[in-house]
Amino acid sequence: MNYHVMTLFPDMIHQAMNTSIIGRAMEKGLLTINAIDIREFSEDKHRRVDDYPYGGGAGMVMAPGPVYRTYEHVMKMIDHNKEMLAQDKTMKIPEESVSERKNETRRPRVIYLTPQGKVFHQKMAEEFAKEDDLVFLCGHYEGIDERVLDQIVTDYVSIGDYILTGGELPVMVMMDAISRLIPGVLNNNASAEFESLQDNLLEYPQYTRPEVFMEQKVPDVLLSGHHANIEKWRREQSIIRTLKNRPELLEEAVLSKKEKQFLEQLRLGEDSKNV
């Protein structure tokens, strides 16, 4: 996976993402993060990238020119990398099919972080994780000139119904969530498959040593060594937690027949309490 972030604050991206799991994944060559400074593509001698909004109003608007030139630079960089990769593949695998090469010419997705976008969720992360390149555009001030957005953006995405200073923090949230789904990024690949929000359920409670803490004991089933019972308990706890905290997720939850019956019993119990 190659991330390309068009931003006014490239150091913010590099410093934050060069640590922990993401940093180790970059060291392994599993992903790259290129933060491109939009100011570098300003034609103003002071590297200015914003201007007053037509029609008046508070604040400033990011001008279309520097953003579009940054986009062109990123596209050329991606094309160059693909050409180099294609040449390497041709040397190693002469029989590569024409259809595979055509797929590689598809333009990468350009994601603009905005409160007006679709709310980011796990299934969206899974979809984005299938891409070879993802381009992110970070807005600032009162936003970006609509004309350049119309030209380059493929996906409008939000991380929630609130306002942040810029797009950098949402981009880092997205890159973290997406990267966890790339094979090899997590030390235990099963972690990405079975952690919170898998099957549209919240994660079950976790426990570690000591066995007793502040007079609270680890549930006996987790000490039993009976893997089938442990798995059943965990699924039931996930259903209980989801019903309590995020009931809307249950509409698309993947449940077995017995789990659906368990959920129905929980709901009946909740209804009886409210009578």
UniProtKB/Swiss-Prot annotation:
GO cellular component: cytosol
Binding site for S-adenosyl-L-methionine: G139, I159, G160, D161, Y162, I163, L164
Catalytic activity line of the entry: guanosine(37) in tRNA + S-adenosyl-L-methionine = N(1)-methylguanosine(37) in tRNA + S-adenosyl-L-homocysteine + H(+)
Superkingdom classification of source: Bacteria
GO annotation terms (biological process): tRNA N1-guanine methylation
Annotated family: Belongs to the RNA methyltransferase TrmD family.
Name under which the protein is recorded: tRNA (guanine-N(1)-)-methyltransferase
Organism of origin: Lachnoclostridium phytofermentans (strain ATCC 700394 / DSM 18823 / ISDg)
